[in-house]
Amino acid sequence: MKDTTGIVAAANVAKNGPNPSKGGSEEILTVARSRLNTAMTAFSETREDELDDLRFYAGSPDNQWQWPADVLQTRGSLQGQTINARPCLTINKLPQHVHQVTNEQRMNRPGIKVIPADDKADVDMADVFNGVIRHIEYISDADVAYDTACENQVSYGEGYIRVLTEYCDDKSFDQDIKIGRIRNSFSVYMDPLIQDPAGADARWCFITEDIPKAEYERLYPDAAPISTLMSLGVGDQSIAQWIGENTIRIAEYFYIEYEKHTLNLYPGNQTAFSGTPEDKMLREMFGKPIRTREADRKKVKWCKINGYDILEERDWAGSYIPVVRVVGNEFEVDGQMYVSGLVRNAKDAQRMYNYWVSQEAEMLALAPKAPFIGYGGQFEGYEQQWKTANTNNWPYLEVNPDVTDGQGAVLPLPQRAQ
């Protein structure tokens, strides 16, 4: 029977989420919203400082981001004043110091090298893996990803690199592994409880992107309408993090799930999980396992969400979340994490330099020009030349000799006041 009233559809949305084929996804979405809110709260203070560092680093004479707004108002730059305005020069010396570090990294880029580590390792196989890794870096333009992460790390404290897979072409099911660039580090929200500087122990991570609503509807025509998402978020204060006035946030959500499995040990230090084909084969060869233990088997999951609907989902073929963190200075103060780069401690020195050069320019501009001093009658007939002597580059200046000392001596030529 056709649901003409829409009541049944609304009930299904309330029960199974906006996508009926994905019943049970509501728990994943609830946890995802909670985790993103946790990350935003944990990083709110440090990222506000990092954003200020980035704006300061990108300061130029056009945007004047290196001058405090209240100072600009008092100096007249924001009010268009010309009578009492004072110069606010920006001589940005920070890029040269940042580039001293990043250029060193460009000359000595970190490389991935596979080294045989035990008696079972194969040197030839290690060389094969090294070749595969070099090929992945080549087809990915990995140098750009490394350089971007380093630039962000040095300038304001944190950069990110990601690993992803893409289909080789439109007519193939084969996929290439690639190393991707993350230009905007503020779009990444990683588990704040990590201890590893690269984030290898992260339990979850978000890579967010805000797209126009029209673009969202074009990319995901089968997803729940935006009006439905807004109705689902009624009473949820975090809805503003996902749905804006003209945009909607799409997030790649990586998370780790643990499953209990029994690990069996067989002669020759061979192991296999119970129920797997390898375990059945080893049981046929050796019989009962020597030892067993319960193990948490880790699986990395990936899904693309809008906060209230799962747009795509699949398993990630790896043991770690494929987002690598590149961190600068890292401090934990009273349980709050603070991250900074090279710019943070150079801001006051740069401000002081801007003040100095602005004051020097102001003093030179306001300094009076020394007038010419001469005797009466020496300038008669040449007044126009002498009135413009300090603005025009005359090839010569003429004067009248004024003999007044009674002895016929010519008085000295006009001179500038000292």
Question: How should these model regions be labeled?
Answer:
Residues 265-418:
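Extended, charged amphipathic alpha-helical segments
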Residues 1-312, 316, 388, 415-418:
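Extended, helix-rich architectural segments
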